[in-house]
Amino acid sequence: MRRPSSRNAKLAKIPLGIAGRAAVGFGRRLAGGDRTEISADLNQKAAEQLFAVLGELKGGAMKFGQALSVMEAAVPEEFGEPYRDALTRLQAAAPPMPIADVHRVLDQQLGTGWRKRFASFDDEPAASASIGQVHKAQWSDGRTVAVKVQYPGADEALRADLKTLNRMTGMIGSVIPGADVKPILAEITERTEEELDYRTEAANQRAFAKGFDGHPRFVVPKVVAGAPKVLVTEWLDGEPVSAIIKRGQEDPQGTVELRNRVAGLMGEFHFSSPSVVGKLHADPHPGNFMMLADGRLAVIDFGACAPLPNGFPPILGQMVALAVEERFDELTELMYSHGFVIPGRTITHREIADYLRPFTDPIQTESFHFTRKWMQRVAGKATDLSRPEVKTGMSLQLPPEYVMIFRVLGGSIGICAQLDAEVPFMKLMQDWVPGYTEYRTAG
């Protein structure tokens, strides 16, 4: 991995370049140029410069890119190509770790006799992750396994990347429409220590594998062995959801059934896991999911999970029920009493109604077709500073226990839009979110 100082030097070049472009753009406007055209040109060039530099980074930037990947569907068409190119670079495979380093990490983590635990070990990496790479191997009992090995120095490099990226949240947000960058980076930073210790991921994965053991629609590979910087799990062969998204763009007519099934399964997995496992899978990006040949959805990364031992909070279901029935006066009272309104701020139920309506389409029908155009429209309204609803949004907040829930919900919806899929959203809500059915019946 590159040294942190090299990363910081590259990132330090960005503000000067963007500031220079802004000055030129301001001068052109003073000279009578078209404001919209000049602003679009400025944003395009700023985006290209920012993405070009971030695309060279790994670690924190790669994790950041994975988090942003679910927002791709919300980006306006004029930014779509540079945004997708940037995501490709941010998530691209890192240069492979020298095999001597891989063996050294295995010596340190599994003991110098680690080779006796494997019948065979492929020295060529099968895949790369943000802080490590995966090798295919055969365990001593004959099982095919995936061996995830953390890059030496990944912890220091990741912390350095995230510290620098956190200083750039405003700049990044200005060229990525619809992306609420600051909380994304805050979450990644907060969970860095957990994700750097693969024993935490192993514990999460064991819980999910137990909860979904024998499930007809989902499969979680079992953990075979674990250490702080090495994780060995069962190997699964399947088609990544990221590949299905791409295939759907190339052949929309021939993939409708598959895309709808994938989106429905991902929705069911995220909605059901707090009840089944007591945890929420908190890293919803397409690279963490695969469709197997038998039609089951496989989930293969559990580095980020949020504990929900009692399932989703019933208040969530109550809020959705009130929004469905447009009982915004009661919803506003509920939001005040449970900390969704910043203390000292005043919001009317009419303002809440106007603010929430663009987001409530998926809960108005039994089944909803998520598309890029819908996501773009919603994101556009949410970030249009000329709209009074944006001012309303500035008076709202997410209580800490809801931050990860809404992050996962937003990520799942983003993937559904990328899949251009129809999902029985309300049925999932009724089946798995407590408070929804009861509150509607009570109302």
Language-model region placement:
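Catalytic-loop of the protein kinase fold
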Residues: V276-P286
